[in-house]
Amino acid sequence: DRQDPIADIVYTFEGGTNNVVFSWTGPNLNGVNAVIPSGTNSLVISGTPSVNITATTQYPYQVITDGSACSPEIVYTGVIEVKPEELLVLASAPATENQTICAGTGTNTLEPIIYNLEQEAISAVVSFTPALPGIGYTLTSSQVIISGVAQAAAQASTTIRTFLYEVETTGCGPARESGTITILPTPVMSLYAGDENQPSVCNNSPIEPIDYIFNPQSGATFSITWDQ
């Protein structure tokens, strides 16, 4: 992982040499250096990779003794392999990342939320806060798919409930993406005051007021129709 330090690689030199030379034999690995600590006969390769890569990349190097009393010089070679930071990319429509839906199989159900696994990501997990009954996820070789039908247990009777989901890859990085799924309550309306079935009234005379209350949190509006 290019964000994690490598384990130190230490070479010691002795005998007929008092120095070694380090070099990259391929591309330089930024963030990783080789030094000989003062007063020692050791070469230490250490650091944290800092490179812009989208696939696993190998960085070969060599260490050669220098100025030895006898030849030939000794050559050691090695490779440091760096994996890219994994990436999650929303593949479904932008509007799917945060949705407001209803419970049950009626209208306004969840449209699948799909993230592509990129830059060598091969797995991910999805968590819901709080738990969201009826909604889960599936994992393919290249995608994470959040889908399902919100159960009635996810729905409050009169208030809106919001659930946070987070997608996290399991490898380098890791990559994280999040969004919300909001569950509307079911529509509720009840008679508050007055008589639904009014007694006969004379023309041009007022009726007794009839009051209904409903829950606007469900997103419902009202309309009046007259039965002829």
Describe these PLM feature segments.
Residues E14-N19, L29, L117-S123, N215-T221:
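Short proline/glycine-enriched turn/loop motifs at strand-loop junctions of beta-rich domains
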Residues A55-S68, S157-G171, Y212:
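A short beta-strand micro-motif common to beta-rich folds, especially ectodomain repeats
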Residues E85-A95, T186-D195:
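Proline-enriched interdomain boundary motifs that mark the N-terminal boundary
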Residues D4-T12, G106-Y115, S205-F214:
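A short beta-strand segment in extracellular, disulfide-stabilized domains
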Residues V21-L43, V125-I145, T221-Q228:
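Low-complexity "stalk/linker" and mucin-like segments enriched in Ser/Thr/Pro/Ala/Gly
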